[in-house]
């Protein structure tokens, strides 16, 4: 059974997602809004539908897909254009959407490289792609809620891994793959215990660019914060080593 299949009938996870505060997904949802009124937008891994609902309320033709039946059952109450999918091939034709995004999904998928390729495939030329995930290669920061992020030893290991990834991208780009992790099984559940991919901004950018995108923004802040703080955090390349990985790209024409 694939890791994604564990979410198929997970009612408890649907209840967990239903408790998200709107501030958690506001930046992602606002960035996902297409530039043209009424344009089509897709939220991949839509959960219980909060982002889809926000887009629909703003006048866009919002769609959502998820691998979880309990999630989709709830999401359809927000928007009937939410549907179950297999977690691999998106059930839409090529170049179908003005904007496509995935919030905290990439770290949970079995084939992250193929997942990014699918996001790009269903985005029209000139369209927007928004991908946001935890940065498991943190070197700086706080609120290190996952063991991969904690402690000086892990942060040093993350620094060295980032340097190795950079060399690999230069010398053998066709061999680059996201690192995999073993999910953590414990009670109580904490966010991303179930993550199986060591997502990070460096590789997310790499695979977006390899699939024909221009990356417009790489930020370590996945939520709205005060503008001076946001500017300072995202000014330097250290943003690749902090907090989260929030990327905005355009599919090349």
Regions found by a protein language model. Name each.
Residues 1-90, 99-103, 116, 197, ...:
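Conserved N-terminal segment of class I S-adenosyl-L-methionine
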Residues 50, 110-118, 128-248:
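S-adenosyl-L-methionine-dependent methyltransferase catalytic module, highlighting the catalytic core
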Residues 90-92, 109:
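Helix-loop segment at the mouth of the active site in Rossmann-fold oxidoreductases
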Residues 104-108:
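Short catalytic micro-motifs in class I SAM-dependent methyltransferases
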Residues 250-253:
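C-terminal beta-strand of the catalytic ATP-binding
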């Amino acid at each position: 059974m694939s890791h994604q299949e564990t979410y198929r009938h997970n009612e408890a996870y649907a209840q967990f997602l239903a408790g998200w505060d709107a501030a958690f997904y506001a930046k992602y949802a606002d960035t996902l809004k297409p530039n043209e009124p009424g344009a089509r937008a897709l939220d991949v891994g839509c959960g219980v539908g909060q982002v889809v609902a926000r887009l629909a309320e703003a006048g866009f033709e919002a769609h959502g897909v998820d691998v979880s039946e309990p999630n989709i059952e709830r999401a359809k109450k927000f928007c009937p254009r939410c549907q179950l999918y297999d977690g691999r091939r998106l059930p839409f034709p090529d170049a179908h959407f003005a904007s496509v995004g995935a919030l905290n999904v990439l770290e949970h998928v079995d084939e992250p490289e193929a997942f990014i390729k699918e996001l790009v495939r269903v985005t029209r030329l000139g369209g927007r792609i928004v991908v946001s995930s935890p940065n498991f290669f943190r070197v700086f920061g706080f609120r290190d809620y996952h063991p991969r992020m904690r402690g000086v030893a892990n942060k040093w290991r993350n620094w060295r891994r980032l340097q190795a990834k950079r060399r690999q991208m230069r010398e053998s780009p066709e061999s680059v793959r996201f690192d995999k992790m073993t999910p953590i099984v414990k009670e109580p559940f904490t966010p991303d215990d179930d993550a199986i991919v060591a997502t990070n901004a460096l590789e997310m950018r790499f695979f977006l660019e390899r699939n024909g995108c221009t990356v417009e923004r790489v930020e370590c802040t996945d939520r709205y914060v005060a503008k001076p703080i946001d500017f300072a955090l995202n000014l330097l390349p250290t943003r690749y080593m902090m907090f989260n990985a929030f990327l905005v790209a355009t599919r090349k024409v």
